[in-house]
Amino acid sequence: MYLRYMLTFSFSPFSHLHSERIYYRQLEEKDYDAVYQLRYDPRVRRFISSEYEKSDEAVSHFIRDSKIKTENAELVMWCMEEKSTQQVIGIIGYFRLYPEHHRAEIGYVLLHDQWGKGFASEAVERISLYGFEEMNLHTIEARVSPLNIGSVKALEKNGYQWEGTLKESYRVNDEFTDTAIYSLFQRI
């Protein structure tokens, strides 16, 4: 079956979602402290290629910018809140959208003290389902450091298949590192 149309996305009104242990909502200014930790904790940063200006204004700008870009359907990002504690545990979303190809790139980051609890697997499952059912995606792609074993396991647990590795494709902390590409396809 050939799809001869380009997808159009609209994230307004914003979709608040749930999974077993996680509530997914729009990122807000009240999430400043958690976003600061996600952006600047070196234990988290070791797997992320982006370099961020370290300032209060940069964190506030990131939060405002994510809302604007979501309203403009350039991306969609959810703040993940653990239901039992109502504490922010991370961020997940589609950071690159390719509507002409019916494809998007999923990305997520968890606070370090939330690693190893199964939250990444649960969130990837829920947001992948949203991508297929609500956004009508054909392909969801993830790009991860092969050294980030927890992230690789979360993807594989949800059926993502390893597509290949780009050698020394990103610079993290002034060192070149590989990127593993994983994909999940909607079966029609």
Placement of each model-derived feature along the sequence:
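Acyl-donor (CoA/ACP) binding surface of acyl/acetyltransferases
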Residues: M1-P42, M77, E81-I188
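Hydrophobic residues in alpha-helical segments
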Residues: R39, I48, T70-E71
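Conserved GNAT-fold acetyl-CoA-binding loop/helix
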Residues: R43-D65, V76
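Juxtamembrane/interface motifs at transmembrane-helix termini
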Residues: K54-E57, S66-I68, E81-E82, V109-L111
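Short loop/turn motifs at secondary-structure junctions and domain boundaries
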Residues: I68-E74, Y160
